[in-house]
Amino acid sequence: MSLPHATIPTNLRRRAFRRSCDRCHAQKLKCTGSNANLVRAQCQRCQQAGLRCVYSERLPKRNLHKEAAAGTTRATETSQPMTATSSTVFSSLAETPPPYCSPPTHIGTSALKETLSEPSAATLQFYDTSINFDDPESFPGGWPQPNTFRDDANSNESSGIPDLGYDFEGPLDATAPVSPSLFDLEVEGNSSSGQSNTSNTQRDLFESLSDVSQDLEVILHGVTVEWPKQKILSYPIGDFLNAFGRLLLHLQERVITSSNSSMLDGCLQTKNLFMAVHCYMLSVKIMTSLSQLLLSEVMKAQPCGQKQSTRMDWYWSGSTTRNDNGRAEALPSFHSNLHIGELISHLDPFMHALSSACTTLRVSLRLLSEIETALGIAQEHGAAASIRLVLSDMPSTSWQILGAENKTITPASRLLSVLWSDEAGDEEPKSTKASGKTINVLRRCYKEIFALAKKHNIA
């Protein structure tokens, strides 16, 4: 007779035990017992302590994804009755107003006094017993009104709070006062905030002028050292003109100074005047060196050979020159990569150099004239005015730099008269270098270049 086979369920969970005993697991120590699946011997620590090793069953691993999904489902199911409950509560609140929605009770009513507990003896020393909360007349200044959100001017003065003058109930006035020109004086209030703003503006202006001064110094070094080593017509002129434009922009900035300004404001204004005049002198020296290079380039481009003269005659006359045999002379050759803008320089280098020099000097002269106007230099005292007198064939004696003792000239002109005293005295320059008679050299270069332009009908 055979026994029936035992049915083994298929869903039995496999029991797993820890690899370390309970004592080693609790102390976070490495267990030295046996790692056999069925028989686990005692570890050395348990043997030395005379204890029995116990290996507990390992807890099953948790499935976090399933638990999170189950938690979301429970939260969804729970929120539905809560939503219904909350809607019921809010509807009941809308029907029956709460007690705190009723009109507020006066602070001096007997109900409030009954609510307050009787103060202790230690607290009574901080109370003013002369104030009766039932009598508004006993409160100093009367009861404060419930809709009072701002004090009047009298209360501000009495409390020591300055009235800033801002009225948020009316429209804001965004118009700013018109400022005078640079280095002028305007009467303003003597408030400390106004003086501080003026000082900060003067410092910002000095930093801007210092940056322009550094750029002009770099350009002056390039004109006197780097540019003579190469063709002047191929050198970029944009940096020079942009520096002139920035100087003009900073000189046109408005700085308000007060008649009661501090000594510091006066010192800052004088420092800005010196820096502005320094930038102006750098500009004049750059124009002097540049005009010398342009005049030298024009002189080099003058026709001196038969080949160049024939090419210029062919371009300007419109007829072809023929030799004794009646054959036409060789036409000028053109490079395959010749650009349209380079065609005039290829056919007539002299006219190209002369027209380029005239254009550069005209633009520089106009910027220099506007800088003199913004700086406050009178036309009869500036270098630009002297150049115009030369170009108009007027006697040079009509232009002169007045002495410092003349009180009618501006501060910038008075300062220039001192700084130019050793560079603009004689009519003829003692040296052709930029360090010599700067203005006289500048006037001579302008006169010679525009005389050639007038001769060739391009002035």
From Swiss-Prot:
GO terms for cellular component: nucleus. Pfam families: Zn_clus (PF00172). Residues 21-53 bind DNA. It comes from Penicillium citrinum. SMART domains: GAL4 (SM00066). This is Transcription factor mlcR. The gene is mlcR. GO terms for molecular function: DNA binding; DNA-binding transcription factor activity, RNA polymerase II-specific; zinc ion binding. InterPro entries: Carb_Metab_Trans_Reg, Zn2-C6_fun-type_DNA-bd_sf, Zn2Cys6_DnaBD.
